[in-house]
């Protein structure tokens, strides 16, 4: 098991390292997104792949020697085994407790979003929740959440709406949910936290890029 954990950490480190070396500064944002998604799957599947090799075993003469093991040695061995603490079991308990806490935290965050109380409207065929309290605009799954101050004269600030609409359209929430689940079960992997930040940053760049393109198109049409 320890070998698999080390392989997972190594693979995710390599995938992330290659991203920083060759893709982080490139404008291939859509490619970057799928590279990170496939890289995540690769990092957590390859370590479980084993290649069996057949070894030719030559028959060698076996010399059998009967020897009686002193009773005192057997008793001492049994006593030592009984007194030895099972650290493996303790580590398993720690692992599942931390994973359980992270899963509970993720579910609580989702529940908190879903129970946000606000005015629901359909704006340009998108579900929008208008909240009285001040929040930074965000989207989750197929819904956009923003403060009422961005909704004036039956219109939402164009740039903000387009930005969040792109997150919804490109289903960025599923990427985030995936990385959160992976993080919950592999919290021991130091690279997974950098991986999450890289994915979210790439989502923001993707949305900004699409907003610029759409705003230019709208400006051309209006002129």
Specify the residue positions occupied by each region the protein language model found.
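Short helix/loop segments within enzyme catalytic domains
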Residues: 169-170, 194-223
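Active-site scaffold of zinc-dependent metalloenzymes
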Residues: 129-154
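Active-site recognition of the HExxH zinc-binding catalytic motif
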Residues: 158-179, 207-208
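Membrane-water interface at transmembrane helix exits
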Residues: 19, 23, 104-112, 167, ...
């Amino acid at each position: 098991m320890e070998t698999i954990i080390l392989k997972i950490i190594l693979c995710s480190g390599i995938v992330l390292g290659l991203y920083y070396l060759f893709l982080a500064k490139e404008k291939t944002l859509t490619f970057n997104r799928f590279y990170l998604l496939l890289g995540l799957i690769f990092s957590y599947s390859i370590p479980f792949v084993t290649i069996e090799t057949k070894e030719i075993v030559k028959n060698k003469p076996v010399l059998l020697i009967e020897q009686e093991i002193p009773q005192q040695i057997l008793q001492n061995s049994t006593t030592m085994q009984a007194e030895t603490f099972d650290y493996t079991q303790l580590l398993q308990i720690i692992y599942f407790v931390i994973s359980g806490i992270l899963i509970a935290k993720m579910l609580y965050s989702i529940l908190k979003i879903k129970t946000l109380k606000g005015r629901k409207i359909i704006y340009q065929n998108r579900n929008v929740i208008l909240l009285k309290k001040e929040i930074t605009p965000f989207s989750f799954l197929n819904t956009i959440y923003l403060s009422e101050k961005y909704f004036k004269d039956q219109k939402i600030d164009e740039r903000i709406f387009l930005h969040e609409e792109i997150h919804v359209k490109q289903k960025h929430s599923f990427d985030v949910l995936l990385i959160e689940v992976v993080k919950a079960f592999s919290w021991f992997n130091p690279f997974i936290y950098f991986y999450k930040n890289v994915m979210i940053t790439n989502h923001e760049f993707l949305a900004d890029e699409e907003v610029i393109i759409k705003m230019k198109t709208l400006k051309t049409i209006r002129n």
